[in-house]
Amino acid sequence: LYKDHVIPDLRALKVLNRLRKKNFKDDTITLELVEELGKDGISVLDQTKYLKPLMPGPQIFTKRRPTENEMLDVAFGFKAAKAIGGMDLGQTVVIKDQAVMAVEAIEGTDACIRRGGMLARGGAVVVKTAKPDQDLRFDVPAVGLETLHSMMETGCKVLAIEAYRTLFVEKTSVLKEADCAGIAILSVEQEHL
């Protein structure tokens, strides 16, 4: 448990003990840390307060547009991503032909994309959404160059993010590379699928 003999201090042990009585889901751990910081008068702010310009509205960003079948996968993927988000599992799914190839869990977005893309054997759709009850102080969904590179490694063809609720970082570089690779990137609102 304590690799390299790094042992938590008494305060951290108390936090871990409280968590043991609850669960070790991402949101539970993070909320416990936010509450602990609050005891010292430290407020954790909404991450999006200063990052709204990085959270685009609905649009297609790339030269390549998703096909009709890929849009069916996007719609299916949104439902799946919201379902896993509601269980605090992750925020990303990889879909092909309306079948779930991978669901993000503790391994993170990029590992999920690589696993799902490999299982799909090319042509997969990646969908990233916010959790249904997303606490905007932490774990706001984000995509960037690493996301795109994971997709390119395994031949994924579409990245769909939730409009207004996903951070799109390194956008200029991402779009340039996506256009060269023939990958479609779009942001959508679930109610418009």
Segments (PLM) and residue ranges:
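Feature captures the catalytic cores and cofactor-binding loops of soluble hydro-lyases/lyases
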Residues: 4-18, 31-32, 111-193
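Short, active-site-adjacent cap segments at secondary-structure transitions
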Residues: 1-2, 51, 101, 167
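Conserved mixed alpha/beta catalytic, RNA-binding, or beta-rich assembly cores of soluble enzyme
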Residues: 23-27, 40-149
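N-terminal glycine-rich phosphate/adenylate-binding segment common to multiple enzyme folds
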Residues: 1-49
